[in-house]
C-alpha cells in the first residue's frame, strides 16, 4: 500500500519532464502507474477479504500519529474504483488534450497525484491520516478545477469548491479530535468496533459524529452545500469524469459507509442523513431535468445520486449496506462513462448545449450505443448494473416498510427513492435525446436547411483511442448487470460488521416481486414525463434557478469582500506611526487584558518600585517618550529615543544585571 502511494507521488514529480519529452502521449506513461496499482490491488483480494492486509509505520509518536494503512473488503472495492477509473481517465486525456494545450504537464501531475491521495484516503486506518489525505484531495481538486485559470468561471468555481470543502474539512477535524480523544485511539478499525461501547460517553460522541458527517456531506455535495459541484463543471471533462463521478465526491459516501457499522445508531445519524439524503436526491433530479448543458445535467444528476447513496448507507442494516455499495459501484461506472461521452461530443462538435446538437448519433454510432447503455444503467433499466443495484435498494426499503414496525422513516426513504428515481429516468432520457436526437426547429438553436428543418450538427470523427475508455466502462456496466456476484462476495466481510444477518443477494432476476414492479413503474412514469417534455419544461422553468443556499453563499462572500475593503481602508493608511501605534497597543493591551481576565493580582501585593532609582529611570523613559511625540525635528526625536534606551540600561543595572545594562548601552 505504501508502495502505491510512493509510486503515485514519484510519477507526479516526474510528470512535467515526461510531458516535455513525450508531449500529450505522456498521459499514457503516467496512466501506467494507477493501472499497475489496480492490477496489484486486484491480486491482493484474498488478503483484503481476510482483513490481514495492513501496514503501520510510526510517524509522530508524540501526537499518536502513525501511517496506518489497512485494506479490508470495503477499501479494496473503493481502491479498484479509484485506480481503475483513474487509469482510464488519464489514458482518455491523451486524446482530449491537443499537443499545444497549455500546462498539460502540471495537469497530469495533479491528476495522478489526486489518484494517489484518493487511494491513501480509502486505505487510511487512522482518522488523522485520513484527514490529511482528505485535505490533499481538496487542494488538488482546487488546482484541477481551476485548470483554465484565464477564465473567470474556472477561478470562481475552484475557489468556491475550496471554500466549501475546506470549511467542511475543518468542521470534520473537530469531530476527528473529539472522537479520537474520547475513545483513546484514532485507529478507524478500533473506533468502529468500539462504537456501541462509546455510546456511554454521553453526547460528546453524538457531537463528534455529527461534525464528521458535516465533512462528509460537504465533500459529497449534499444540500445545502450542493452548489459547488455544478459550478465545478468549469473544469476539463476528464476532471469531471474522475473527481466528480468516481472519486472525490465519493469520499463522503465512503466515510459514511466506513462509520456506519459502529455509529448508525447515534442521535444525529438518522435525522441528519435521512433529511439530507432524500432532499438531495429529489432536488438534484428536479434541477437536472431542466438543464441544457450536458455537463450540468450530469452534475445535478450526480448530486441526486450522491444523496441516494448516502440515504441508503445511512440505514445501518447489512442489506442496506450491501445495496448502497452496489449502487456506488454502478454509479462510478455509468457516470464516468457519461462524462467521458460528453467530453467526446464537446471535443468533436464544439458544444455541449443540447439545443445546438442534432443528429450526432448518426455520425457517432458507437458513442450513441455507449451513451444509451450508460444512461439506461443510470435510469435503472435492465439488464445493466444500475438496475441490479436499484432493485436491491428498492427490495431492501420495501422489506423495511413491510416489516410493519411502525417506523415512519422507512416510508419516507421508500417514497423519496421512488420520486427521485422517476426524475432520474427523465434526465437520463433527456441526456440521450439531447446529445444524439433529432431536434425540431421550435427547440433547436441551429441553422435551418432549405426544408426549414434544423441542419445536423457537424461532428469530427473521434479516434478509437479516444472512445476506448468509455467503451471499457460500458462493457463493465453490462458485465456488472449479468454477473454482480463478485461485487457481493467482495463486500460481504465488511457487511458482516453490521449487527444482524444479510439476506440480500445481488442478482439480475429475483422473479416478479414488489421491487421489480416498482422499478417498471418508475421507468414507465419517467419515460412518460420525458415524452411530455414541453409541458414539463414550462413547469420547471417557472421556478427560481438559484437556491437559497447558493444565494446565502454569494451574499456571505460579498460581505466578506466589503469587510476586507473597509478594514484595509481603516488600517492601511500609509502612515508608519499609525502602524507602530497599532502594533504597540496590541502588544501591551492584549497581554495585560488576558492577565487580568485569568488571574487578577491583589492590589495590596503590587509593588511600584524596589528603589528610588527605578522610579527615576521610569520617569526618564516616560518623559523621553512623551518628548518624542512633541519633537518637531527627526534628529531630536532620535536623541530622545536614545534616552529611553539609556533609561532601560539603568533599570537593568539597578536590578543586578550589569551584563544586560552594558549590552543595552552598546
Region roles according to the model:
Residues 361-369, 424-526, 535-559, 563-567, ...:
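Cytoplasmic/organellar membrane-interface segments at the starts of transmembrane helices
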Residues 433-435, 528-545, 599-602, 630-636, ...:
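Juxtamembrane/interface segments at transmembrane-helix termini
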Residues 88-105, 109-130, 139-449, 458, ...:
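Hydrophobic transmembrane alpha-helices and their helix-loop junctions in integral membrane proteins
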Residues 46-53, 178-188, 381-398, 482-500, ...:
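Membrane-helix interface motif
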Residues 4-21, 217, 221, 281:
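N-terminal signal-anchor/start-transfer transmembrane helix
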Residues 2-3, 13-109, 178-201, 206, ...:
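Transmembrane helix-loop-helix hairpins at membrane boundaries of multipass inner-membrane proteins
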Residues 68-83, 202-217, 408-421, 506-526:
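Hydrophobic alpha-helical transmembrane segments
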Residues 30-45, 168-177, 371-382, 469-486, ...:
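Hydrophobic alpha-helical membrane-insertion segments
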Amino acid at each position: 500500500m505504501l508502495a502505491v502511494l510512493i509510486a503515485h507521488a514519484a510519477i507526479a514529480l516526474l510528470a512535467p519532464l515526461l510531458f516535455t519529452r513525450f508531449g500529450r502521449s505522456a498521459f499514457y506513461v503516467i496512466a501506467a502507474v494507477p493501472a499497475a496499482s489496480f492490477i496489484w490491488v486486484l491480486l491482493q483480494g484474498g488478503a483484503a477479504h481476510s482483513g490481514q492486509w495492513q501496514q503501520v509505520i510510526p510517524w509522530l509518536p508524540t501526537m499518536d500519529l502513525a501511517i496506518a494503512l489497512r485494506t479490508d473488503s470495503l477499501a479494496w472495492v473503493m481502491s479498484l474504483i479509484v485506480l481503475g477509473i483513474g487509469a482510464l481517465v488519464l489514458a482518455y486525456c491523451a486524446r482530449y488534450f491537443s499537443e499545444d494545450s497549455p500546462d498539460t504537464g502540471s495537469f497530469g501531475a495533479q491528476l495522478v497525484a489526486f489518484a494517489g491521495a484518493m487511494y491513501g484516503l480509502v486505505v487510511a486506518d487512522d482518522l488523522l491520516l485520513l484527514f490529511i489525505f482528505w485535505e490533499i484531495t481538496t487542494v488538488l481538486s482546487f488546482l484541477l478545477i481551476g485548470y483554465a485559470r484565464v477564465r473567470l468561471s474556472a477561478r470562481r468555481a475552484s475557489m468556491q469548491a475550496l471554500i466549501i470543502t475546506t470549511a467542511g474539512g475543518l468542521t470534520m477535524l473537530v469531530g476527528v479530535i473529539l472522537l479520537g480523544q474520547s475513545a483513546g485511539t484514532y485507529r478507524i478499525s478500533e473506533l468502529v468496533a468500539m462504537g456501541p461501547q462509546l455510546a456511554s460517553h454521553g453526547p460528546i460522541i453524538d457531537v463528534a459524529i455529527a461534525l464528521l458527517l458535516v465533512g462528509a456531506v460537504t465533500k459529497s455535495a449534499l444540500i445545502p452545500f450542493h452548489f459547488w459541484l455544478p459550478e465545478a463543471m468549469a473544469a476539463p471533462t476528464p476532471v469531471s469524469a474522475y473527481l466528480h463521478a468516481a472519486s472525490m465526491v465519493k469520499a463522503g459516501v465512503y466515510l459514511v459507509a466506513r462509520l456506519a457499522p459502529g455509529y448508525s445508531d447515534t442521535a444525529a445519524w438518522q435525522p441528519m442523513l435521512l433529511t439530507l439524503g432524500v432532499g438531495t436526491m429529489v432536488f438534484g433530479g428536479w434541477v437536472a431535468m431542466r438543464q441544457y448543458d450536458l455537463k450540468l445535467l450530469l452534475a445535478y444528476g450526480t448530486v441526486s445520486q450522491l444523496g441516494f447513496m448516502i440515504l441508503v448507507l445511512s440505514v445501518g442494516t447489512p442489506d442496506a449496506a450491501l445495496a448502497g455499495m452496489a449502487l456506488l459501484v454502478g454509479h462510478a461506472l455509468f457516470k464516468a462513462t457519461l462524462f467521458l461521452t460528453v467530453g467526446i461530443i464537446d471535443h468533436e462538435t464544439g458544444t455541449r448545449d443540447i439545443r445546438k446538437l442534432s443528429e450526432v448519433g448518426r455520425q457517432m454510432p458507437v458513442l450513441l450505443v455507449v451513451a444509451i447503455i450508460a444512461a439506461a444503467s443510470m435510469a435503472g433499466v435492465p439488464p445493466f448494473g444500475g438496475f441490479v443495484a436499484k432493485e436491491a435498494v428498492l427490495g431492501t426499503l420495501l422489506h423495511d416498510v413491510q416489516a410493519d414496525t411502525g417506523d415512519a422513516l422507512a416510508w419516507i426513504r421508500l417514497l423519496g427513492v421512488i420520486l427521485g428515481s422517476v426524475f432520474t429516468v427523465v434526465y437520463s432520457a433527456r441526456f440521450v435525446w439531447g446529445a444524439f436526437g433529432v431536434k425540431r426547429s421550435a427547440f433547436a438553436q441551429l441553422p435551418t436547411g432549405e426544408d426549414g428543418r434544423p441542419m445536423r450538427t457537424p461532428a469530427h470523427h473521434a479516434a478509437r483511442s479516444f472512445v476506448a475508455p468509455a467503451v471499457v466502462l460500458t462493457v463493465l456496466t453490462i458485465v456488472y448487470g449479468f454477473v454482480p456476484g463478485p461485487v457481493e462476495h467482495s463486500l460481504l466481510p465488511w457487511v458482516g460488521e453490521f449487527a444482524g444477518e444479510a439476506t440480500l443477494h445481488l442478482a439480475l432476476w429475483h422473479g416478479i416481486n414488489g421491487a421489480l414492479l416498482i422499478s417498471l413503474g418508475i421507468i414507465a412514469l419517467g419515460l412518460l414525463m420525458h415524452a411530455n417534455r414541453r409541458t414539463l419544461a414550462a413547469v420547471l422553468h417557472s421556478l427560481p434557478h438559484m437556491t437559497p443556499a447558493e444565494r446565502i453563499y454569494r451574499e456571505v462572500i460579498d460581505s466578506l469582500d466589503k469587510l476586507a475593503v473597509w478594514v484595509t481602508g481603516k488600517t492601511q493608511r500609509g502612515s508608519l506611526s499609525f502602524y507602530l501605534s497599532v502594533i504597540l497597543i496590541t502588544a501591551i493591551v492584549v497581554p495585560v487584558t488576558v492577565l487580568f481576565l485569568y488571574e487578577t493580582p491583589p492590589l495590596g501585593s503590587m509593588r511600584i518600585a524596589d528603589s528610588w532609582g527605578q522610579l527615576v529611570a521610569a520617569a526618564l523613559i516616560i518623559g523621553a517618550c512623551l518628548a518624542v511625540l512633541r519633537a518637531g525635528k527627526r534628529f531630536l526625536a532620535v536623541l530622545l529615543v536614545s534616552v529611553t534606551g539609556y533609561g532601560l540600561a539603568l533599570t537593568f543595572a539597578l536590578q543586578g544585571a550589569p551584563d544586560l545594562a552594558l549590552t543595552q548601552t552598546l
